[in-house]
Design a protein with these regions (language model features):
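Sequence-structural signature of mature extracellular/luminal beta-sheet repeat domains
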Residues: 1-113
Length: 113
């Protein structure tokens, strides 16, 4: 899996067949991805300023979109630990223009959660 951020999609590469396909479109300008301990895709979405998980049936579950009542900036890189904890970076560059999201006010400092 990898992101095509400006084209608002997540692509899937099949190493066996060499086929490239669209996994999710729109992706809400998703950037960083990882797998949780159950193999589900967890993504950082710049446009919606949230962390989501793609369920086995394709449904999207929002895991986080706020901290202390304030909207996240533009979650970027992410990792899931063996114990189920999720760590991610939250810089502001996805809300600074239209290239990777939409312009918006920053509510939180740049941080790692």
């Amino acid at each position: 899996m990898f992101s095509d951020i400006p084209n608002n999609r997540i692509l899937r590469w099949d190493d066996c067949s060499g086929a490239l396909s669209v996994f999710r479109e729109p992706s809400h300008n998703a950037n960083g991805h990882t797998r949780d301990r159950d193999g589900r895709l967890v993504s950082c979405e710049h446009l919606t300023r949230r962390i989501t998980r793609t369920e086995y049936d394709g449904r999207i579950t929002v895991l986080a979109d706020r901290f202390d009542g304030k909207r996240l900036n533009s979650p970027n890189d992410i990792v899931c630990a063996q114990d189920g904890a999720i760590w991610f970076t939250d810089p502001s560059f996805g809300i600074n223009g239209h290239w990777e999201g939409e312009p918006a006010a920053q509510e939180l400092p740049h941080a790692v959660y």
